[in-house]
Regions:
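Short beta-strand segments of a lipoyl-like beta-sandwich/carrier module
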Residues: 3, 8-12, 18-43, 58, ...
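Short, conserved beta-turn/loop elements at beta-strand boundaries and strand-helix junctions
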Residues: 21, 53, 196-202, 253-256, ...
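Long, charged alpha-helical "stalk" segments
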Residues: 37-90
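A short amphipathic alpha-helical interaction element
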Residues: 69-117
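Surface-exposed connector loops and short turns at secondary-structure junctions
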Residues: 165-187, 219-232, 290-293
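Beta-strand/loop subdomains of soluble extracytoplasmic proteins
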Residues: 168-202, 208-214, 255-259
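Structural microfeature recognizing short secondary-structure transition sites
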Residues: 193-239
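Edge-of-domain interaction segments
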Residues: 222-299
């Protein structure tokens, strides 16, 4: 008997993709005159689409613009605009929640650089706000269509795996757990549990009903150009380090109850009762037999 590390794993089906999809909606009059290619990535300050040849740039933030931003306006939306202008290299103003004359001058410089009408004000439909870089998943409008309603569907730019995990297995996973993701070509990449959903969803297929929670797994080192793919996700649900373990086949049911092992001592053998712990990898954690002892495994 020697000390070892036992690792229990659970393998489940997952789907590799770019996470949740959201819709970019136009809020202005005019005609769609430019659209990005599906699959392209758009970063801060670059156009998401164009209306009447005027670009609608991307700003980073979590609050959509809902009113005209102009001199004297105060609020979190002003701070969002100023922070983006600062990141884009415009200066001369304080990044705070107040739209001042200095903010107006920065907006005018920005509008001039974009080739827009220089007004010094920003309307809600003039920009697109997202929490970071976006990837164009699907175009919802053709060129020449009216600039109102859904224009395109987008996602984030980081690939992740979504798993619909049976609620019976929910106790096996928690945020931060390590995972291994096997791709369709057999290659594997490392992952980590990013989130475990709090809402259970019931799905019926024929006579079978399953209840699942959504688990997100972040992945790194992906070289394969999959936009979406079915994958196998192996999650390390439990790990015990530096424990004494024997092959499961070495366990014997004792007449008095419980389990034991057959200890080999030279030409003699004896039975020793043991307390069992974790089972994994065809082995079982045991206590009650000293390290270095030899145990018999029945054939």
């Amino acid at each position: 008997m020697t000390r070892t590390t036992l690792t229990a794993t659970k393998t489940v089906d997952g789907t590799l993709g770019y996470g949740d999809t959201f819709t970019v909606t136009a809020k202005s009059q005019g005609t769609i005159t430019w659209l990005p290619a599906e699959g392209s990535t758009i970063t801060r300050g670059h156009a998401v689409y164009s209306v009447d040849a005027d670009r609608r740039p991307l700003l980073y933030g979590t609050m959509p613009l809902y009113r005209e931003l102009r001199d004297g306006v105060e609020g979190k939306d002003v701070e969002l605009l100023e922070r983006n202008l600062d990141k884009l290299g415009y200066d001369g103003f304080d990044v705070d929640d107040t739209f001042t004359w200095a903010t107006r001058e920065a907006v005018e410089d920005w509008q001039e650089d974009l080739g827009l009408d220089v007004t010094g004000t920003v309307q809600p439909g003039d920009v697109v706000v997202a929490d970071g870089r976006i990837r164009v998943a699907e175009l919802r409008k053709p060129l020449g269509d009216t600039a109102s309603g859904p224009v395109l569907d987008a996602t984030g730019t980081t690939r992740e795996v979504t798993v619909d995990l049976d609620v019976a297995d929910e106790h096996l996973v928690r945020k931060g757990m390590k995972a291994t993701v096997e791709l369709p070509d057999g290659a594997t990449v490392n992952g980590k549990v990013k989130s475990v959903g709090k809402v259970a969803t019931e799905t019926t297929s024929g006579n079978d009903t399953t209840t699942t929670v959504e688990v997100k797994v972040s992945v790194g080192g992906l070289k394969q150009p999959y936009d979406a793919a079915p994958v196998d996700v192996t999650i390390v649900s439990e790990q015990r380090e530096n424990v004494l373990a024997v092959p499961v086949g070495a366990l014997l049911a004792l007449a008095e109850g419980g389990y034991g092992v057959q200890v080999v001592e030279g030409a003699a053998t004896r039975y020793a009762a043991v307390e069992v712990g974790m089972f994994a990898d065809g082995k079982v954690e045991v206590e009650g037999v000293p390290e270095g002892a030899t145990v018999a495994v029945p054939k």
